[in-house]
């Protein structure tokens, strides 16, 4: 598989078809809007703030996380392969007066052209949508400066995550559109950490993301059975 081929056209089309609804707080991307404050605060805490730092958001989609990091004073670049979501992201940034850049490119190509260019790299809810997650993780490690931070979030692969993320979220509660996820592409924490260990990155912490269907709210916690975030740092000199 070459650098430019680590893309699933069906995955790109899936999110392009929903592009116009990225910023609908009650639409298909409502869960991303709900968890965004948690993700943002986690990144802010672990990096001791983003003001003035160069940040790359990989698989940025319509720009929900990217734009919120720019509001915190970061110099943000959003990266995605979907043309339609990027157009929505640019338009929303224009409407809100938020300054950031968006680029249509694979992470591998961007890493080749921008080695050690960023203080912080975020790769949220993206690894489970590509054919070769190791390639993405390696590229992220090349993009971050020595001492810089990289964050990965994805879904665990087990029976509980199938019940919660596929049966519950997609089929019963209709929180996200049916077919959004493929359970076989979910990644166990041990598998993700093994891929991280193949790079200069070092895993510093892992936290779970929990959904309460009774209150329709999310919180961070120690259980990583379904959604989880891994914090890593490039500790090379």
Curated annotation (Swiss-Prot):
Pathway where it operates: Cofactor biosynthesis; ubiquinone biosynthesis
CDD domains referenced in this protein's UniProt entry, alphabetically: AdoMet_MTases
Protein's name in the database: Ubiquinone biosynthesis O-methyltransferase
Record keywords: Methyltransferase, S-adenosyl-L-methionine, Transferase, Ubiquinone biosynthesis
Keyword Transferase in annotation: yes
Family, as annotated: Belongs to the methyltransferase superfamily. UbiG/COQ3 family.
UniProt EC number: 2.1.1.222, 2.1.1.64
